[in-house]
């Protein structure tokens, strides 16, 4: 699971990478946090992952009931777009705001997060090969990081060519993040993660670890994160903190 606020950090750092200095990205940071939280609330519902704990606390539906879990998730998604619309009041460059909203709508909808989640549900308990697993991961997790980093870039005035590089880097970061999640599910503790471990095995989920083993999965995480750093460095724009953030994926414990 992407940590609370991590997408915001990627968005802010990418915004600053391309010279953004004002508050234009802030409504989008808040909106992405709402969209991410909406996805987690719904993921935890009995109809999907049926998880009781998230971030060390009881999940929304365990505290407030299943109906409120559904409604609060939808409310957050709706509120996210209300908040993004407020960005029109912060700039004369309306085209950048429109472009950012289009990216988020695309990356979190059927072509991204929700599409990946749907394919994941349809294949629950079925044997999967690398190609299908990559598709699910790229859409469920990478799409959120792509949305965060690409909106940061476009709001700061990145070119189409630069935006493509950011998209590729973010895809690598997202895949690395999700594979590291698979590794932590079998190597970490519930106290460290703040949620039950071995949940993938319990739910008969195919993961990178179940396909290739933890050592090979760890090598893949390093390969993907190294490639992401190379892509970002090739932009000839320096943000050492962003590089450090990507590299920390390899060693994270939660």
Q: Can you describe what each PLM-predicted range is?
A:
Residues 21-27, 93-97, 129, 159-162, ...:
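Residue-level recognition of alpha-helical structural elements
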Residues 41-63, 72, 76-87, 108-129, ...:
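Acidic, Mg2+-coordinating active-site segments of isoprenoid diphosphate-utilizing enzymes
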Residues 86-106, 225, 232, 239:
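Transmembrane helix-loop-helix
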Residues 1-10:
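Single conserved hydrophobic/aromatic residue that forms the stacking wall/gate
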Residues 4, 17-23, 59-68, 134-135:
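A short glycine/serine-rich beta->alpha loop
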Residues 21-35, 97-103, 162-173:
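Alpha-helical scaffolds flanking conserved acidic
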Residues 14-48:
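Active-site cofactor/substrate anionic-group-binding motifs, chiefly glycine-
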